[in-house]
Amino acid sequence: MKTVLRMIGLLLGLAVVANVGFVAFVAARGIPSYAPPKPALAQVLATPERLAQGEKLVLAACADCHLNRETGALSGHQLRDVTPDFGAVYASNITQDNVHGIGTWTDAELVGLLRTGIGRDGRYRVITPKFVHMSDEDVASVVAFLHADNAMAQPGPTASHPQEPSLLLKALSNTVMKPVLLPTGPVGAPTLTDAVAFGRYLLVGRYQCFECHSKDFKTNNALAPEKSDGYLGGGNKLLNAQGHEVVSRNITGDPGTGIGDWSEAQLGQALRFGRGPNGPLGAPMPKYSQLTDAEVHALYAYLQTVPKIKNATPEDGVLASK
């Protein structure tokens, strides 16, 4: 018996030492850097169609984090919807400023950042979405817009605020929240005629709804979104503009706790104008005001196919599940 107890004590001691060592390593290393990605890419041609699509995508996917509402420039600010356990996290200046922004970045360097989360300096932007499933054409549209003659993208001499990650975010960036690799081949988008496939593309590739509407940022799977814990079942914790906790909505088709009783028109109202069947949808839920009828239809069609999850959330007066 004494021998067994000694062995247990020894194992526990080793576990404590290992944990202390890991914490010390993470604290010292911080968020890691990587070799900058080098996508094979010719210069992006800024066609009128790409500039229009790029503006739509930037407004939908980038502006909430990077747009300074007072100046109208993509100069960045603190992400107030990130919960304190991640520390203080800031969106960078992505205007065309040559010193503080991306004015000297090449198209390929921007694509590398959008796809992997790694900048040309090798710094990993751990909170930045990784648009690994976005089509090459949509990515090119974003890049074209960021280099275009638009007021949002014009040079703004605002220095990006240094990140202040918590120990938890440092640990996560060294373990489960790592960057993704560049796609190994061309990335296309399904056609509008296949509503379910196109709806999935919108949800996981273009607008990345699963990031907030699955169970937890810490367990999301960027490469295989459907493998994220609680895929689209809600429960992820964010903050609103007043700093109060907000739990993301269950958007599976469960009729009791999800949106199974919503019509296509009601989904469109919620997405475009922030008006749900039972009341307004508050921040940090974005308003996708430029969604087309075809996009709303595709999203609705895809959501009907997602496995239903019974998970009540505070939206619509439903108590959150324990």
Language-model regions, residue ranges each:
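The canonical Cys-X-X-Cys-His
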Residues: 54, 61-69, 142, 199-202, ...
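N-terminal type II signal-anchor transmembrane helix
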Residues: 1-34
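Alpha-helical membrane-targeting segments
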Residues: 21-24, 28, 157-186, 314, ...
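C-terminal capping alpha-helices of c-type cytochrome domains
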Residues: 23, 106-119, 130-156, 263-277, ...
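C-type cytochrome heme-c attachment and multiheme electron-transfer modules
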Residues: 118, 176-192, 197, 245-276, ...
